[in-house]
Amino acid sequence: MTYTYSFRPVRPEEGDQIAFIEQVCFSPATALSPETMRARAAELPDMFLAAIAHPEVPSGMPAGLGSVPAMRRDNDSVQQPDGRQDACTDGKSSSASGMKAASPDDAHDQIAGYITMMMTDEEHFRDAFFEDPSLHQPNGANVMLLGLEVLPSFRHQGLAAELLNRTIRQAEKEGRRKLVLTCRDDKIAMYEKFGFQLCGISKSTLGGVTWYEMEHRLQK
C-alpha cells in the first residue's frame, strides 16, 4: 500500500498515539515514559509536527482520505535518524511491550511519525527539556529538538528528512537563531548533510549513552 502524507501539529487527544510511537522507536533505556509524552502532547501540542498517513485510494474508488494533496514517496532511501532523533536502530528491543498501537479505527488520523521540540533562550541541550514542559519559552531564540520518530512500517519514505527540513524552514521563517539536537556518534555525518555542525559531547546522560550535541545555526 502507498500513502500520501499531510503535516500538522498534534492534537491533545492524540497523546496515546504519541506515547506509543515513543515506546516503539526507542529502547527501554532511552524511551520517555508514556505519562511524559501524553503530558507534553496535552500541554505543548504545537511543539510537535506530525506526519499523517492517508492510504491512497485505487483509481475509480471514492476519494476519501487518499485524496489529500500532500507529499508522496513510495521508496525513498533517506536514512531514518538515530539518537534522540531515533528509530530504535540501536539494536535494542523497543519498550512498547504490552502497549496497543493506535489505528485509524482508534483515531481519525493515523500518525506515521513526528518531530517534537521546545523553544528556549538557553544555548545548550539539557535533559530537563525532556520532562518539564514549563521550560518552553514561546519566543525563545533557539529550538531544542527532543525527538524525531517514525514508525517502522512508514520508514524508507523520506518522512524523517521531510519532518526535519520542514522544522528547519519554520525556524528560519520565525527568525530563530539556531536548532540544537543530540545524537550518537554514528549519526553525526548524516546530520551534517542537513546543515548541523558538531559542538562536542552533550551534557545529556539519558539512558547512560554518550550523546553528541549538534547545532544548525540560522543567524550569527
Regions from the PLM with identified roles:
Residues 146, 153-155, 174, 180, ...:
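Acidic/histidine-enriched, beta-strand-rich ligand/metal-binding domains
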Residues 173, 185-209:
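Conserved active-site alpha-helix within GNAT-family acetyltransferase domains
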Residues 164, 171-184:
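Conserved GNAT acetyl-CoA-binding A-motif
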Residues 57-149, 155, 205-210:
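Conserved acyl-donor/pantetheine-binding loop and adjacent beta-alpha core of acyl/acetyltransferases
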Residues 48-53:
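Cytosolic beta-strand hydrophobic patch enriched in CBS
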Residues 4-17:
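A short beta-loop-alpha structural element at the N-terminal edge
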Residues 9, 19-34, 40:
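Helix-loop element at the rim of GNAT/NAT acetyltransferase active sites that forms part
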Residues 150, 156-169:
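Conserved acetyl-CoA-binding loop-helix of GNAT-fold acetyltransferases
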